[in-house]
């Protein structure tokens, strides 16, 4: 079951947000200034071209008990990092050993070796608690994908977009073992994620936004310059491409500032009055890796999806068989030689 919006309310909220003048968050004033030798394009604007990545163990939200500690130092920082590493490994082990279709082949294991970001306890900088201000609807939306992972899928539509090899990288940028490649022209910025080949094309000109009735998986973005900072406003997101519980009312404002050769300052603010009680903001530096990117061959032709769905049908058949004979499990069905029914190619056998 898909947790949908009240579309009439969502449209009203979208119109209000589009018409409103968005206040600039207080943290914008504290952004670092570009160095004198920060790279620029041949046409004079700051250059964002390169391969960029955020590699850190600092969590998006501040853990409970740290709401009044935006930064942490010394032995406390070491203990905090070890706590994050332990929780990450335990969560990954639990997911890979659970009776659900989940796994990344250990690709995210490398994240645990990353340090804290400037001794911060969260990437969220506003609200000051470092936590996302959910409404009940937003909290329900955010929990839906993880709950659906526990369910037997009826079809591919019940699985995540990246599992279906349809969409991987999207906005906003976030910490990831997979970098993003930026390409730039005088009137466009292109952000390419090799992870499931997500490519976002951002016009930098005066063209109007597309009609609000048109929704896209990665939204529709428009860029404009605020001094040496590129401001990207994105809306028209398909509500199924939710970010932290967002819906059709999502409006995203991102700010990119090239600080020096190795650093691109990135910040974004999330607006969605249906999912959040107030706007919330994140900021962090992206690092120029200067490393080559390699093809992300999604499931090498997505062979995993038919196997996953056939396994789901076998699970259903097993449950129906057990229920029909009022058995607790197949192991109770024993003819004396220790054999029990099994499932092969979706058929019951002994």
Give the location of each predicted region.
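PEST-like low-complexity, intrinsically disordered acidic/proline/serine-rich tracts
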Residues: 2-3, 26-350
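N-terminal secretory signal peptides that target proteins for export/translocation
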Residues: 1-10
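Bacterial N-terminal signal peptides
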Residues: 13-23
